[in-house]
Amino acid sequence: MNILGVRYGHDASAALIIDGQIIADVAEERFTRVKNDASFPINSIQYCLKAGNINSKELDCLAIPTTFVQDAFHSFFSIPEPILPQTQNKTARGLRKYIGNVFSEKILKDQIYSSSISPVLPLYQKPLELSETCKIYFVEHHLAHAASACYTSGIHGEKALVVTMDGVGDLVSNAIWRFENNCIESLKKFDNTSSLGWFYANATEAMGWRQSCDEWKLMGLAPYGTAQPKALLGFYPEFKNGDLVKQHNYGEFGRWNDHGAIHYHGKDAFKLNRLVHELGIENFSAEVQRVIEEQAFNIILPWLEKENTRHLICSGGCFMNVKLNQKLWNTGKLDTHWIYPNAGDAGIALGSALHAYYTTYPDKQHQKLTHLYSGPEYTNAEIKEILIGRGLVYKYVENPSEVAAKYLVRNYVVGWFQGRMEAGSRALGNRSILMSPLKAENKNILNHKIKFREHFRPFAPAVIIEKMHDYFVNPREEGFMTCSFDVVQEKRESIPAVVHVDGTARPQMVSREANPRFYDLIRRFGELTEEYVILNTSFNVKGEPIVQHPREALKCFFDTGMDVLIINNYVIEKPALQV
């Protein structure tokens, strides 16, 4: 069964599964080079179909992770007479332009404006040619989040609590589910007056950053400050015993502008900005982080007790917060804590496809996700052609892992471009910038000369999985950088470039099965230095998506202070290194 999931909105993406196997999963931003791109993901769709060696008419199912499409039609079109053409409302006119971008005039006139409008008429009919037998599934936003996590968790025969938490999707901000016997059951949903994601977004905007994009910065800054309890009361919803006890009216959080795009803005950001100045940026960030942890605990822990389970599954953008995830793990109340690694909205294309598959085949047993390498890859022949076309000096090596490890020992910055690109926002050893973790100053070198970003933002360690207990307190096998851990005290001075100011790190535990070439690199570095850890950060600069194509890797390499670029088996050095 061929199922294509398509997410249209911010963090647009597409994912293809064939007979339950994940074939491709990629965000549109990687092709357009627009961070968090919200345009229709036609490039992602084309890649998915190519990866599956099929065309759109061979799709058995199109899965769309929203039910709001139909609501939008009924909100802005009075059937059979549409409201939209008569209104001067800016929001309505903006939505009309949005719809016009993906619908042909014929579809608009013949189907949307008719009383026979199908409840499953997709926005995707214009750019995709589907067969008449292709089924179309609309999957509620948070159910798609839940499915992305449940059907990749590897949990069988046990009951698990599932929590999805983000800004808002299909008018839901947080949701509680039960996962048992491969079935997802809804237990509780909270509307947008309950959104902790919007609170965090408002706080991010108050700091002068972009909400729904720069929340990482606030999380990274928080450990530099001291939380100020009660300082932010009145700006967030409050929970107790697993339920909402105080709503927060966020007002209109977004509107459709004249260009046919949604513009997000939180009214609380102006008021919160005054508190940023009163408290200081570090203390403000620390209090925001304290609030999100406190309120998430007030939701999750009572529900764990109600469900009498020690297995927790999470997805949604709020669970990209690695400090929250660490606090949950350290409660001692969990035997299993699975966070879908592509937890933001880019991950719900896959979630909707998985839900469609396991709804169709409920007796099929899902497989635990072992890697996220589901994007484009390039052959040595393709790369060599690009290098020759650029007139670059290069060399071919049989063992790039060995070569890279030796460069790192010499404290060079290495661009590392290998195999299939990762899905999600974290570089996991295929589109990475690497450096030795042994010198504290390497953190500043990378922030200032390579990434061009704020000094307080930490870097992640990649460690071979057999050594995780040597470096981290109370670790679990964590291959996707979804949780931070305390670094073992005696190791903090040994690998200072990957230890944050609070003594934590957000590691990727690398197994040879998941990524043999990256594993061999780290292992060889360990043999040479006695530390089986390297510094791993995403292959991009601030404000840009992770590189997807070799040409983008070359541009980033020459635009920054990287010393060496290794693309598959080819090595390119900066002129200063060429002797």
Question: For each of these PLM feature ranges, what is it?
Answer:
Residues 55-123, 147-148:
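Short beta-strand-loop/turn "lid" adjacent to the catalytic site in phosphate-handling enzymes
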Residues 1-4:
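Extreme N-terminal starter segment of soluble prokaryotic enzymes
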Residues 30-54, 296:
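N-terminal phosphate-binding loop and adjacent alpha-helix
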Residues 109-114, 136-139, 274, 278-294, ...:
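Short acidic-aromatic active-site loops that bind/stabilize oxyanions
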Residues 7-25, 32-35, 78, 85-86, ...:
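Flexible beta->alpha loop and helix N-cap segments adjacent to enzyme active/binding sites
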Residues 286-312:
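Phosphate/ATP-binding catalytic cores across multiple sugar-kinase/actin-like superfamilies
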Residues 45-60, 299-308:
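Phosphate/pyrophosphate-binding loops at sites that engage ATP/ADP/AMP, CoA/4′-phosphopantetheine
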